A protein has these predicted regions:
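Conserved N-terminal subdomain of the carbohydrate kinase-like
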Residues: 43-55, 72-162
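Short pre-catalytic strand/loop immediately N-terminal to key active-site residues, enriched for Gly-Thr
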Residues: 56-62, 243-256
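Short, small-residue alpha-helix embedded
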Residues: 68, 191-192, 253-276
Length: 310
């Protein structure tokens, strides 16, 4: 198939998290500035080279978080997105009114259908509503020998509201976290996983090290739920490297889906073959840019702008 692309304007500056397909074309466009013709030949022989990622998460009917946010994030990074739906939520920018879990059989069937057919480069997990689903997901990850997993342990919201029951939380801690290449808890989730209170940067660092001891190969404790400048500070620990990652604080109320977007961006970067720490750095920068172009839709908290101006 012959695809012809005409460029009508210069690509805005965006370095760290620029997706590979945009970056590759941008290098050509930058040399010619405007109205260049780019021809790209795509054949079936190239299909196996297309990076593929999977999201195992819930659906957000309002389109701001969950698999909707994940798939948009994958698309931005030019990664083909696949999905395993774990629950269906009725929600909008103002809140959640209903949650229905998918059956374990459905979750299993979705996962196996994709895994036996495609070469998945990375997987992220999001909302796993109950103990049974968490166990099924963990069992299938082990059965397929898949290790490139980003675990977003969706247990507590950034406002401190518990989202799953205590039994599911324990299963998340004991069964799924040890399978994570990268675990990405927010403040309140990190408090549960690390069994400690978190009020300072030093607490975040200690929590990251404690969660690492649960078996995760690396941990990113997010500033979500923290106050002041710490809202834009995350802490990374991988057993050797303890890093503080800080970006500018974006003044917006429209932050719905931020955590989903971050973990999806990390997974996309892993699928592109980037090392874990680099994948996290670029994902964090991507989310910062997306927050600058957050969408003021609905009557409440809108989502981040996944496709900020390109």
């Amino acid at each position: 198939m012959l695809v012809s692309v005409r460029v009508g304007r210069i690509i805005p500056k965006y370095k760290a998290a620029t997706p590979f397909c945009v970056l590759g074309w941008a290098k050509i466009w930058a040399k010619q500035n405007l109205f260049l013709e780019l021809t790209h030949i795509m054949t079936n022989s190239h299909s196996s080279q297309i990076p593929i990622a999977m999201t195992i998460a819930g659906s957000d009917s309002g389109g701001g978080a969950g698999i909707q946010a994940d798939l948009r994030t994958f698309a931005f990074h030019c990664v083909h997105g696949t999905s395993v739906l774990t629950c269906i939520t009725a929600q909008n920018t103002q809140g959640v009114t209903r949650v229905d879990a998918m059956s374990p059989e459905s979750v299993t069937a979705q996962f196996e259908a994709v895994m036996i057919d495609m070469r998945i480069g990375a997987i992220k997990t999001g909302m796993l509503l109950n103990q049974e689903i968490i166990k099924i997901v963990a069992k299938k990850l082990v059965a397929f020998g898949f290790g490139n997993v980003v675990v977003d342990p969706v247990m507590v919201s950034r406002t401190g509201a518990q989202l799953i029951d205590d039994e599911a939380i324990k299963t998340m801690r004991d069964v799924l976290i040890p399978l994570a290449a990268i675990a990405t808890p927010n403040r309140y989730e990190a408090q549960i996983l690390a069994d400690m209170d978190i009020h300072s940067l030093e607490d975040m660092q200690t929590a990251a090290q404690n969660i690492y001891k649960l078996g995760a190969r690396s941990v990113l404790v997010k500033g979500g739920g923290m106050t002041g400048d710490l809202k834009a500070v995350d802490v990374w620990f991988d057993g050797d490297r303890l890093e503080v990652l800080q970006t500018e604080v974006i003044d917006t109320n429209h932050t719905h889906g931020t955590g989903c977007t971050l973990s999806a961006a990390i997974a996309a970067n892993l699928a592109l073959g980037k090392p874990r720490f680099q994948a996290v750095q670029e994902a964090k920068n991507y989310v910062t840019e997306a927050l600058k172009y957050a969408l003021a839709i609905g009557k409440g908290q809108g989502p981040v702008g996944h496709f900020f101006p390109l």
